[in-house]
Amino acid sequence: MLSMLLPFGNSGVYASDVDREDRPEIAKLVQAFPTIEEDYHVVKLVGAGSFSSVFKAVDRHFDSYDNSYWISSQIEDQMPHDKTKRPKNHFVALKRIYATVLPSRIQTELEMLHELRGSDCVLNMITAVRHQDQVLIVLPFIQHAEFRDFYMKYSLPEIGAYLRDLLKGLAHIDAKGIIHRDIKPGNFAWNPYTQRGVILDFGLAQWQEADAPTENCCVDKLRKLKQEGKYYDYFPFEKTIADPPEGYLLHDPRPTKRADRAGTRGFRAPEVLFRCQNQTSSIDVWSVGVILLCFLTHRYPFFRCEDDIDAIVELAHIFGRNGMSNCALLHGQIWSDNIPTLLDQKHNWLDLIASITKNDENLILETSSDYQVALAIDLLDKLLELHPSKRVKAKTALQHEFFNACGVTRSGFEAENPFRSDFPSTVEQ
């Protein structure tokens, strides 16, 4: 999805410095919104995607309104502490959604952005403007750095600070009953100087279903359909393993396996790949685990799959044949392979990371204490849990001892720490 923020190198743009090469696109924006120049002076095209384009602009009437509802500590932190040295112009980001996007999709995004106001770790919507079939969302302008510029240099305490704000934002999103669906470094604006970050881009977000997945997930749903007479297994499970099907039904009454598969390749959870219909905010937590794996292995992106099948095979090489087989059954699917390099059991995280980074410099495993490394691996294991109902929640993950060991504040979530009793006491600090 499209990132709506500029990197540090472009943050010092003045109102008179309109980029020459961006003028045609800015002219199209002004043509689509004839009155936009009355409120905002557009200075730069940040980027454009399939569904939207984003511009940097000066808010002409910033001092005329009460901005306290969206001016978070994130915005304050990126400004000079001396108010007399603060820039005269206050920048915002203008996200223009193309008319080809379904109105219902635009409405959902606006409703979610409005509902999510109030968190320092989630991008707050300032306002929205509509002119005929054109919609413009006004958002805060936040300085950030590219993930590739710092992820290989970060120590465990710095990784902890990064994950703190990411998980805090996800906890807020989850509490509102929303699934982001596209958590990745490109959708988390991180400022390495202030050590703060915000989650952005809710173009794929969805409201979470009321029914959370059971321990047996899709299997329980299929059983319920059979009991209600809405599903009949014409080709029994036991027979399809031993023999090929004798034929195919002309009018098959069985429901097809349809589920939302939106997201970015390499960051989608196994239940998304197996087309589970009971997806929850746990898919966002899985994406956080992939980001942590990128930090620990110095590999980004870590997974380089081209399609869903390749993605499942990549996971199988880490979690083993047995793990993926059980995961598939959980979602009403069958996993079978003849890959000779595939092991039956899951790889040990420490061994995997060590083998990948053995020739790298600034190794986290060598520069951090054994206690911190062990806690990081334990957190990674809880984030990358194949079973969605057993995967740690974002709010619970914030209480993990890893953050305390790295000197990272737990961001105001004062729940009882559920990890103190289950983490091995044999690990020495």
Swiss-Prot record:
EC number(s) on file: 2.7.11.1
InterPro entries to which the protein is assigned, alphabetical: Kinase-like_dom_sf, Prot_kinase_dom
Active site (catalytic residues): D182 (proton acceptor)
Pfam families linked to this entry: Pkinase
Phosphothreonine modifications at: T264
PROSITE patterns: PROTEIN_KINASE_DOM
Keyword field: ATP-binding, Cell cycle, Cell division, Kinase, Meiosis, Nucleotide-binding, Nucleus, Phosphoprotein, Serine/threonine-protein kinase, Sporulation, Transferase
SUPFAM superfamilies per record: Protein kinase-like (PK-like)
Single annotated GO MF: ATP binding
GO BP: ascospore-type prospore-specific spindle pole body remodeling; cell division; meiosis II; signal transduction
Broad EC category: transferase
UniProt KW Transcription keyword: no
List of residues binding ATP: V46, G47, A48, G49, S50, F51, S52, S53, V54, K95
Keyword Cell membrane: no
Positions of the Protein kinase domain: 40-402
Catalytic activity entry: L-seryl-[protein] + ATP = O-phospho-L-seryl-[protein] + ADP + H(+); L-threonyl-[protein] + ATP = O-phospho-L-threonyl-[protein] + ADP + H(+)
Subcellular location: Nucleus
GO CC list: cytoplasm; cytosol; nucleus
Family affiliation: Belongs to the protein kinase superfamily. Ser/Thr protein kinase family. CDC7 subfamily.
Subunit structure: Interacts with spo6.
Task of the protein: Required for the initiation of meiosis II and progression through anaphase II.
PANTHER family hit by this protein: CDC7 KINASE, ISOFORM A-RELATED (PTHR44167:SF23), OVARIAN-SPECIFIC SERINE/THREONINE-PROTEIN KINASE LOK-RELATED (PTHR44167)
Listed name of the protein: Cell cycle protein kinase spo4
Gene assigned in the entry: spo4
